[in-house]
Each structure stands twice: as structure tokens, then as C-alpha cells.
């Protein structure tokens, strides 16, 4: 049968490209590694600002990768629908700053706030970056049933310290010993999409 297409994007030497290749090899996918230059990144900024209708530095920076990877997919494959990891940080306590939550109640309320506000910024940005290249994005981490279930889990089970328990600890634990991801990727420290 036909292999699943997977995609990664980054500048040459990016550690995220290396880890994405490890996962692709492990899963046996048809992997596309998209290496971009600083010039490619800078050249895309004006188009990205137009597409997402925002000048916000953080938003634009986070959108360039989505735009460039979806542009590559549109120009080089017959893929029309793509899956991404949007929402996993918000739903699954993936932001490093959450380890400093002063209480379990604060961790829970911040996670709920992030999910509630997600559609104002990240999802809209991502959708516009991807759809501007004629693709549709699917976001499994934002499935309503998954979000409702995950938010109902006690904060005690989701808390992390950044050392013994990394961000998205419970999600990582769910994949542990399942043979679905290599341990070196499953248990690696987080790197922001726009930084990797």
C-alpha cells in the first residue's frame, strides 16, 4: 500500500528535523524534510501577515513555518488534508511556564483559559496559514470529546516539574511502552515549533 506522507520543516541543522526523521523512520512513512533558509523565512513574512491579517510578532513568527510547510505540500504532493498538533500545548499542559503554577487549581484554570481562547489566536492563525495554500487542516488534539475528557482529568495527574515529569506528561505517559514512538523522541524536552 501507499505510505503515509509526513512533513517537517526547519533550517539546516535544526534538531527538530533530526527528531522528525527518527519518527518517520520508526513509523516507515514517506517523509519530506523541508529545509529553509533565513531568506526563505524573511521572504514569507509579508505574505503571512496578509494571510493571517496580523502584525503581532509572535503570531507572525509562529505562522511562517505553517505557511511554508503547507506551500511545499501544495506544490509537491497531491495531499489536500493534513493533520497537525495544534492545541496539544493548550489542552495537555505543554507550556513550560505551567510548571510554575502556584497551585493545582491555578494549573487547571490556566489550562481551561488557554483552551477557551485558542480559537482567537492559534487556531485561526494556523488555519489561515494552511488554507492560503489550498489545504485543509485537521486538529485531533482539539476534538471536542478529547478536550472535554482531558480537561476533566484531575490537575494532580497533569502537573509536571520539568525534570522528572516533563510538560505534556500525561500525554507522553499514554504513549509510553506502546511502541508507537521511539523513547528518545517521546521523552525529549520541548522545543517550540517556531524555535525548532
Regions found by a protein language model. Give the residues of each.
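PAPS-dependent sulfotransferase catalytic core
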Residues: 183-196
Amino acid at each position: 500500500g501507499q505510505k503515509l506522507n509526513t512533513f517537517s520543516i526547519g533550517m539546516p541543522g535544526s534538531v527538530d528535523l533530526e527528531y522528525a526523521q527518527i519518527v518517520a523512520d520508526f513509523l516507515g512513512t514517506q517523509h519530506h524534510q523541508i529545509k529553509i533558509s533565513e531568506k526563505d523565512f524573511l521572504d514569507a513574512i509579508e505574505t503571512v501577515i496578509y494571510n493571517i491579517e496580523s502584525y503581532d510578532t509572535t503570531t507572525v513568527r509562529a505562522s511562517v513555518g505553517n505557511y511554508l510547510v503547507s506551500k511545499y505540500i501544495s506544490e509537491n504532493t497531491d495531499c489536500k488534508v493534513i493533520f497537525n498538533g495544534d492545541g496539544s500545548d493548550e489542552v495537555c499542559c505543554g507550556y513550560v511556564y505551567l510548571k510554575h503554577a502556584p497551585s493545582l487549581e491555578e494549573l487547571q484554570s490556566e489550562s481551561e483559559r488557554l483552551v477557551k481562547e485558542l480559537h482567537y489566536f492559534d487556531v485561526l492563525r494556523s488555519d489561515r496559514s494552511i488554507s492560503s495554500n489550498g489545504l485543509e487542516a485537521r486538529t485531533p488534539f482539539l476534538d471536542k470529546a478529547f478536550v472535554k475528557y482531558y480537561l476533566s482529568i484531575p490537575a494532580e495527574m497533569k502537573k509536571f516539574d520539568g525534570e522528572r515529569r516533563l510538560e505534556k506528561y500525561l500525554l507522553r505517559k499514554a504513549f509510553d511502552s506502546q511502541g508507537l514512538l521511539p523513547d528518545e523522541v517521546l521523552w525529549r524536552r520541548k522545543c517550540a515549533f517556531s524555535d525548532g
